[in-house]
Amino acid sequence: MNNLIKFIAALPKAELHLHIEGSLEPELMFELAKRNKVTLPFPDVESVKAAYNFNNLQEFLDIYYQGTNVLKTEEDFCDLAMAYFYRAHRDNVLHSEIFFDPQSHTERGIPFNVVMNGLLAAITKAEAELGMSVQLIMCFLRHLDEESAFATLRMAEPFLDKIAGVGLDSSEVGNPPSKFRHVFAEARQKGLKLVAHAGEEGDASYIKEALDILNIDRIDHGNRITEDRLLMTRAARSAIALTICPLSNQKLQVVPDLRNHPLPYLLRQGLRVTINSDDPAYFGGYVNDNYKALAEYCGLKAADFVEIARNSFLGSFLPDQTVAAYLDVLDKYVDSF
């Protein structure tokens, strides 16, 4: 097991499911609160950590949105993103496609360009300093209405050349993908890639809607695809990637026992599964922690993790030439280990 953990630690990989607001560690939360004179509902860092005891997605979202209140300036968003990039770099993440939730900021009076300029400054720094490649995916909050999503897409117009795609996150059950069919169609017309959280707490019908109605390019989470055999076969044949987040699933009680996690089964069925950290500050683990958890609890072997790492590059929105270059780095690492 020790050799496998060492192998995983340095394995070249991409991360395709990371909410940048969900990488806000309690220490940085307090630092930004002090900087911006924001009063937090917690007396200290340990109290924040103690509050990270969720029973479901909604309980997590309630505290998640509280945390965003400390983010006010371009510097704040840059510091937030850089903290993640430094941490991901330690896990040998070569490429990251990060979600951001502009509505959670614009709704509290933070201009869209403040969010974007801060994130773009961090991306420029990460590319220059760490050699990482980074793409942005702008998520619509599904508990809000489609008109709010349209307004957000309009705000993004000046930055569309800096945004790879749009996504759909927040409270899944009761907010099906079909609620956002028109804004996703417009985003597609603008040349953006499309992803959506589906099949995390919602059943397999949410995944089917995301594929059939939104015409998404990638499935975020997708655990409950196991409920629909035809959908699994379709996903395997189309080689659409699933961005699965094991520790998130455990923390939110989606899969309470990692020994029962569906990822190994989906991998054996030929689906293009990837491993990701989702909201690592809240769920207690970055991407390598998620890899290691599946090694420990699911018995995955080195060859499985190589396939998953390959999937992470193949499932990205990078140009084919860049994907090939990253796969070459991966192959050389495997050959040299």
From Swiss-Prot:
Its EC number is 3.5.4.2. Zn(2+) binds at H17, H19, H197, D278. Substrate binds at D279. The record marks H221 as: Important for catalytic activity. It comes from Zymomonas mobilis subsp. mobilis (strain ATCC 31821 / ZM4 / CP4). PANTHER family: ADENINE DEAMINASE. Binds 1 zinc ion per subunit. SUPFAM superfamilies: Metallo-dependent hydrolases. InterPro entries: A_deaminase_dom (IPR001365), ADE (IPR028892), Ado/ade_deaminase (IPR006330), Metal_Hydrolase (IPR032466). HAMAP family: Adenine_deaminase. The active site is at E200 (proton donor). Catalyzes the hydrolytic deamination of adenine to hypoxanthine. Plays an important role in the purine salvage pathway and in nitrogen catabolism. Keywords: Hydrolase, Metal-binding, Nucleotide metabolism, Zinc. NCBIfam families: aden_deam, PRK09358.1-6. This is Adenine deaminase. It comes from the Bacteria. Belongs to the metallo-dependent hydrolases superfamily. Adenosine and AMP deaminases family. Adenine deaminase type 2 subfamily. Its cofactor is Zn(2+). GO terms for cellular component: cytosol.
